[in-house]
């Protein structure tokens, strides 16, 4: 048994709390399209406009997680898949005062059995369940949807559908084609609407890929907001209506990965300022 003693190093803790606040401010600027100044420790303030001027590339997969979280009923159970969804939840979704139970399978990479685990959790609670997972995770455990009818486990299933394994963009192999696409990304081209019909789920497709966003607003921020509102509205409707729902959010894995990279660089610049270049 581990026993913690003392209050720890207050200055060390304060530095991390400040860094977290700065990161949230940078993400908020990307999310809301607002101008802001970000306080950075004892060194005064730094205008984060320069740090993130190239970040706002429109809707990305982290926005999907945030939109889902903000549309949850209270109380609610949120089950988030391994791989990129749980990472995006950790990075882009802030704390809430709502009564939300967040669940996930052990580990951050393996995607087997996600649907079954989530619907098993639904069978043990009276809260509305929202499951967020990737398209490969849904494909791997699609037969788990049998529990919707057999166990009377109504659920809202949100698929972040980038047609393959988006997480592998984080590996050096992404620079090598065709092996990267054929053996790592493994695009499948599946249409999940018939799967929803097979298991009696209402189906809704939201195309959030860059080529489909031209009519959603004049700027990237406006287009991102429009799609986020569409995702949030779909989640809200699904919990107001009877039965189970599959909300299929089609995204671009590479574009989302590049946005994550730019956001990470912007946060680093905002936290460290010129010190990072010394």
Annotated model-derived regions:
Residues 20-85, 253:
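Active-site pocket-lining segments that scaffold enzyme catalytic pockets across diverse folds
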């Amino acid at each position: 048994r581990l026993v913690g003693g003392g209050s720890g190093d207050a200055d060390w803790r304060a530095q991390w709390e400040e860094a977290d606040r700065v990161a949230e401010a940078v993400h908020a600027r990307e999310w809301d399209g607002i101008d802001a100044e970000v306080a950075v420790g004892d060194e005064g303030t730094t205008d984060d406009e320069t740090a993130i001027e190239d970040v706002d590339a429109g809707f990305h997969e982290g926005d999907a997680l945030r939109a889902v979280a903000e549309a949850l009923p209270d109380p609610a159970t949120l089950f988030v898949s391994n791989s990129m969804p749980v990472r995006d939840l950790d990075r882009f979704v802030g704390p809430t005062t709502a009564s939300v139970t967040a669940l996930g399978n052990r580990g951050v990479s393996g995607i087997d059995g996600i649907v079954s685990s989530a619907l098993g959790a639904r069978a043990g609670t009276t809260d509305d369940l929202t499951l967020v997972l990737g398209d490969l995770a849904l494909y791997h455990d699609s037969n788990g949807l049998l529990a919707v009818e057999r166990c009377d486990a109504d659920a809202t299933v949100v698929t972040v559908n980038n047609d393959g394994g988006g997480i592998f963009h984080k590996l050096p192999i992404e620079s090598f084609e065709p092996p990267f696409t054929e053996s790592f990304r493994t695009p499948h081209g599946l249409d999940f609407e018939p799967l929803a019909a097979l298991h009696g789920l209402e189906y809704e497709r939201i195309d959030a890929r860059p080529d489909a966003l031209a009519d959603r607003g004049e700027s990237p921020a406006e287009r991102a907001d429009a799609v986020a509102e569409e995702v949030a509205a779909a989640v809200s409707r699904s919990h107001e209506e009877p039965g189970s729902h599959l909300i299929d959010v089609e995204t671009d894995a590479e574009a989302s990965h590049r946005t994550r990279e730019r956001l990470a660089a912007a946060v680093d610049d905002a936290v460290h300022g010129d010190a990072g270049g010394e």
